Amino acid sequence: MGTGGRGRPTPGLNVYEVFLSLQGEGKFVGEPQAFVRFSGCNLRCAYCDEPASRSSRRRALIRRVSGEVELELPVPCGPEDVVEVLVELEDLEDTFGTVSLTGGEPLVQPWGALKELIERLRERGFRVLLETNASLPDRAPLIDELADVVSADVKLPSHGPNMDDFPDRCLRFLERISAEVYAKVVLVDEECYQHAESALKGLHRLGVEPIYLQPATGSEHDLEDLWELAGLVNADVRVLPQVHKLVDFIPR
């Protein structure tokens, strides 16, 4: 583990897995990236596609592009351990320059350890993409000067229990971000559309773009409804499903 202030050990990171793949969502879809998936999340979204990552593992699986497990890393682990693994993967595969921090929810990790990880990654020349549910506005200023790009998954009241105030919480989070940012809004069913309209207007007011309307995998949507929603505000709004669910390129 790393060392915090006054020589105290930095709490470790709950890493679920580290793997190489193509980005399947949002602005960088199709780009070769390394992914650090953390375990633990503050939400219980109905459409969550990685529910297993809510719970921690004793050992994080480190996978190559083929899906082959290269090694296992004891959890919790130090930031320097994660960086060392990524450097080894880069030497083996040499096809990625971006590290995506995903989950779970990265911002529930011990702050000192997450900060150190991002700093070490950037020192190594990696671009850092932070994927967050944007529901923890108090954490926004902490990561604003660290991550190169922030991907905000804006939550709607219909996404899960006790989420009525989450669109406002997400907007408060984004108000505190000056780094490059883009937003995703997942559409699960018809109930999402009314809430999505309000979210789009709020994102437009903040100048956040591009905005990706993401039909949930397996859900059904009317083209006219998607067309109308995408044209609601004068901004860069696109409809883009999870490509990695259409073409299974996440190693397992």
From Swiss-Prot:
Subunit: Homodimer.
Family indicated by similarity: Belongs to the radical SAM superfamily. 7-carboxy-7-deazaguanine synthase family.
Cross-referenced Pfam families: Fer4_12, Radical_SAM
Annotated EC: 4.3.99.3
Organism: Methanopyrus kandleri (strain AV19 / DSM 6324 / JCM 9639 / NBRC 100938)
Keywords noted in UniProt: 4Fe-4S, Iron, Iron-sulfur, Lyase, Magnesium, Metal-binding, S-adenosyl-L-methionine
HAMAP family: QueE
Name of protein: 7-carboxy-7-deazaguanine synthase
Reactions this protein catalyses: 6-carboxy-5,6,7,8-tetrahydropterin + H(+) = 7-carboxy-7-deazaguanine + NH4(+)
Domain annotation Radical SAM core: ranges: 28-251
Co-factor binding details: Binds 1 [4Fe-4S] cluster. The cluster is coordinated with 3 cysteines and an exchangeable S-adenosyl-L-methionine. Binds 1 S-adenosyl-L-methionine per subunit.
CDD domains the record matches: Radical_SAM
Annotated metabolic or biological route of this protein: Purine metabolism; 7-cyano-7-deazaguanine biosynthesis
Top-rank taxon, per record: Archaea
Cofactor: [4Fe-4S] cluster; S-adenosyl-L-methionine; Mg(2+)
Gene3D superfamilies per UniProt: Aldolase class I
Residues the entry annotates as binding [4Fe-4S] cluster: C41, C45, C48
Keyword check for Cell wall biogenesis/degradation: no
Residues involved in substrate binding: L22, Q23, G24, R37, T102
Function: Catalyzes the complex heterocyclic radical-mediated conversion of 6-carboxy-5,6,7,8-tetrahydropterin (CPH4) to 7-carboxy-7-deazaguanine (CDG), a step common to the biosynthetic pathways of all 7-deazapurine-containing compounds.
Molecular functions (GO terms): 4 iron, 4 sulfur cluster binding; carbon-nitrogen lyase activity; magnesium ion binding; S-adenosyl-L-methionine binding
Residues that, per the record, bind S-adenosyl-L-methionine: G104
